[in-house]
UniProtKB/Swiss-Prot annotation:
Belongs to the DZIP C2H2-type zinc-finger protein family. GO terms for cellular component: axoneme; centriole; ciliary basal body; cilium; cytoplasm; cytosol; intercellular bridge; microtubule cytoskeleton. The keyword Coiled coil applies. Residues 122-144, 518-767 are annotated as: Disordered. Keywords: Cell projection, Ciliopathy, Cilium, Coiled coil, Cytoplasm, Cytoskeleton, Disease variant, Metal-binding, Phosphoprotein, Zinc, Zinc-finger. This is Cilium assembly protein DZIP1L. It is linked to Polycystic kidney disease 5: A form of polycystic kidney disease, a disorder characterized by progressive formation and enlargement of cysts in both kidneys, typically leading to end-stage renal disease in adult life. Cysts may also occur in other organs, particularly the liver. PKD5 inheritance is autosomal recessive. Interacts with SEPTIN2. InterPro entries: DZIP1_N, DZIP_RILPL, Znf_C2H2_type. Residues 533-547, 574-588, 658-675 have a biased composition (Polar residues).
């Protein structure tokens, strides 16, 4: 326990400041103990509940009571001296602790007062500090302005030079002119010597100016060096970024080219596979139809030996087995196609997913221009996806076509009569049928013209893809001369490749050239034999062997001169002709549109007056094919109408509109005789070259009304590989009433099948 002196010393330490400890002495004790009150207290409860209030109430009575006269209530003996001593010592301790408590309370109150005072002083000090900081900020701003002003004045001083100012040699003042300086010297420095002091004043000023000039030059050099270094660093960074963009673009282009090549290869394989399967099915169908036709032809033959008993059941069973085998094979092929399409679709989806991930990764690192290129690639991918869907639709249509052919064969087999000669079904006949399968396909297509409508979208898509591969868009109305020259070189290379691939290519071309030339000569000779009316010029040539090259490349015409019709023509006549079961329709040309081309003063054989098709296909030759057949009289101006884009589409409405001709016009008989001769020549079948596709014509539907005279037909065809064999089967039935006028390419499809009965006749579908 500390002594009172130590306690006083602790209270008067630095923590409590200069607090004075009051004088302490023990008080006398005269009060008696209140035993009744003590007996009511529960000491255990006070200790358990920490009842400090009860202790505070009883502390005074216990501390200041006198226990010397206390005796035991039971035995009446006084309190034990040792116990009494302990109780008195406890009273003294409690009294001292109460004194310490009072001192501490007073010290705490004093310290709280001092704390409040210190807090007030601190707040005032902070306010003063903020005010001084504001003042310091203002002083700094003022100092900065003054430094700027001084530097500006120094720069002006260095720029203008010291000779512009007049400095007093006796003080630091400077004047604008010498008058002010003299006045200043007279006022302030009268009678003062000038020599030594002026020199002392000029030397420090010159030194300061030189030092400032040196610092300025050094600062400018440092700034220039820093600018140059920063410029070099920016150039290097820009070059590095540009190189990275170029490398990323090259990688993206290479990857895109590889993916395009892979996709085109897969599409070509799939198209080739489907085309081979379709050819096989068509061959089988044509074979069965030929057998059915043979059975039908044999059924009408009557035996002169009497009624014979035919083996109908065996023949019917054999045909049923063949039909069942064909159905099974068709189902197998269909299943195989579906499986292959599914595999290709799964592979395409996997590749598409990989390409999308790769595309996203590349797009994150591409610049704005490369993102635009990636968007264009995405559009092309969408186009290819649409083409694949179109291919699937075409496959479905082919399957429906195969089913329809199979059903038709079943009906034909059930209609076979009983009188069948079993000896005709020999292996030799099957061999001949397999060799003539192409002719059977043609016959089947003639009997069912609706099948050709299914092939038209396929051929249109193929042609559009081929044109797009050569750089010609689908909606292009024409091509430039530079593009035409590029396509000419490309087609020339492709023709050379085909000539190397197919050994008979050149010989077939030569054969076709000779055949066309010979037919043109025959038509010319036949046309020259026909007599002419009086006052009319003679026939020059029907088709010249010279193929005139037009001003625009890839356009060739064959000129045919026809005589003018008499002033009063005979009444209209009707005629019908047939070749290979196809109808030859009369050609009637509408009046040319005056807004398109004006009349030409030169004969139509001259090049610049002709129109050029927007493109030529890859199978075109240099000068051995007919693109336009022009039938014109001499000294008659011609009008050319550009060929529209969709010249394959025509309708009954268009043909009926073209048939509305003004009455009262006559015609000659020259064209009729020429058409008959041409039909006889075209009836002979010609060998189809490799890669050629025939144009099939429908059976003749009846006579047709003669076309309006006063027109000169001009027939033209695209130079494509689909038209190599079209010259063998193309009928040109020219009306005997026609007066020669140019027939434009845009109106050519509308002329076939016109007349009073044209709406009921089947159209001539073309591939």
């Amino acid at each position: 326990m500390q002594s009172p002196a130590a306690t006083a010393e602790g209270l008067s330490g630095p923590l409590f400041g200069a607090y004075t400890f009051p004088t302490f002495k023990f008080q006398p004790r005269h009060d008696s103990m209140d035993w009744r009150r003590i007996s009511t207290l529960d000491v255990d409860r006070v200790a358990r509940e920490l009842d400090v209030a009860t202790l505070q109430e009883n502390i005074a009575g216990i501390t200041f009571c006198n226990l010397d006269r206390e005796v035991c209530s039971r035995c009446g003996q006084p309190v034990d001296p040792a116990l009494l001593k302990v109780l008195r010592l406890a009273q003294l301790i409690i009294e001292y602790l109460l004194h310490c408590q009072d001192c501490l309370s007073a010290s705490v109150a004093q310290l709280e007062a001092r704390l409040q005072t210190s807090l007030g002083q601190q707040q005032r000090g902070q306010q003063e500090l903020g005010r001084q900081a504001d003042e310091l900020k203002g002083v700094r701003e003022e100092s900065r302005r003054r430094r700027k002003m001084i530097s500006t004045l120094q720069q002006l001083l260095m720029q203008t030079g010291t000779h512009s100012y007049h400095t007093c040699h006796l003080c630091d003042k400077t004047f604008m002119n010498a008058t002010f300086l003299r006045g200043h010297i007279q006022r302030r420095h009268a009678g003062v010597a000038e020599g030594g002091k002026q020199k002392k004043q000029e030397q420090p000023v010159e030194e300061v100016l030189e030092e400032l000039r040196a610092k300025l030059k050094w600062t400018q050099g440092e700034l220039e060096a820093q600018r140059e270094a920063e410029r070099q660093r920016q150039l290097q960074e820009a070059e590095l970024i540009h190189q990275r963009e170029i490398e990323a673009k090259k990688e993206f282009d290479k990857w895109k080219e590889q993916e395009w090549t892979k996709l085109y290869g897969e599409i070509d394989k799939l198209k080739k596979l489907f085309w081979d399967e379709f050819k096989n099915v068509a061959k089988q169908n044509s074979t069965l139809e030929e057998k059915l036709r043979a059975l039908q032809s044999h059924s009408v033959m009557e035996s002169k030996l009497g009624s014979l008993r035919d083996e109908e059941s065996e023949e019917w069973l054999r045909q049923a087995r063949e039909l069942q085998a064909l159905r099974e094979k068709t189902e197998i092929q269909k299943t195989e196609w579906k499986r292959k399409v599914k595999e290709l679709h799964e592979e395409h989806m996997a590749e598409k997913k990989e390409l999308q991930e790769e595309n996203q990764r590349l797009q994150a690192s591409l610049s704005q221009d490369q993102k635009k290129a990636a968007a264009q690639s995405q559009c092309q991918i969408s186009t290819l996806r649409a083409q694949l869907q179109e291919q699937a639709r075409i496959i479905a249509s082919q399957e429906e076509m195969i089913q329809s052919l199979s059903l038709r064969k079943v009906e034909g087999i059930h209609k076979v009569p009983k009188a069948v000669d079993t000896e005709e079904d020999s292996p030799e006949e099957e061999m001949e049928d397999s060799q003539d399968e192409q002719h059977k396909v043609l016959a089947a297509l003639r009997r069912n013209p609706t099948l050709l409508k299914h092939f038209r979208p396929i051929l249109e898509d193929t042609l559009e893809e081929k044109l797009e591969s050569m750089g010609i868009r689908k909606d292009a109305k024409g091509i430039s001369i530079q593009t035409l020259r590029h396509l000419e070189s490309l087609l020339r290379v492709q023709r050379e490749q085909k000539a190397r691939k197919f050994s008979e290519f050149l010989s077939l071309r030569g054969k076709l050239v000779k055949e066309v030339t010979s037919r043109a000569k025959e038509r010319q000779e036949n046309g020259a034999v026909v007599s002419q009316p009086d006052g009319q010029p003679s026939v020059k040539s029907q088709q010249s062997t010279l193929v005139t090259r037009e001003a625009q490349p890839k356009t060739r015409t064959l000129q045919v001169a026809l005589p003018s019709t008499p002033a009063e023509p005979p009444p209209p006549t009707r005629q019908s002709h047939g070749s290979h079961g196809s109808s030859l329709t009369q050609v009637s040309a509408p009046a040319p549109r005056p807004g398109l081309h004006g009349p030409s003063s030169t004969p139509p054989s001259s090049g610049p007056g002709m129109s050029t098709p927007p493109f030529s296909s890859e199978e075109d030759s240099e000068g051995d094919r007919v693109q336009r057949v022009s039938l014109q009289p001499p000294k008659v101006p011609s009008r050319m109408v550009p060929r529209p884009k969709d010249d394959w589409d025509w309708s009954d409405t268009e043909t009926s509109e073209e048939n509305a001709q003004p009455p009262g016009q006559g015609s000659g008989t020259l064209v009729q005789s020429m058409v008959k001769n041409l039909e006889k020549q075209l009836e002979a079948p010609a060998k189809k070259p490799a890669g050629g596709v025939s144009l099939f014509f429908m059976p003749n539907a009846g006579p047709q009304r003669a076309a309006t005279p006063g027109r000169k037909p001009q027939l033209s065809e695209d130079e494509s590989d689909l038209e190599i064999s079209s010259l063998e089967d193309l009928p040109l039935d020219l009306d005997q009433r026609e007066k020669p006028k140019p027939l434009s390419r845009s109106k050519l499809p509308e002329k076939f099948g016109t007349g009073p009965q044209s709406s009921g006749q089947p159209r001539v579908p073309a591939w």
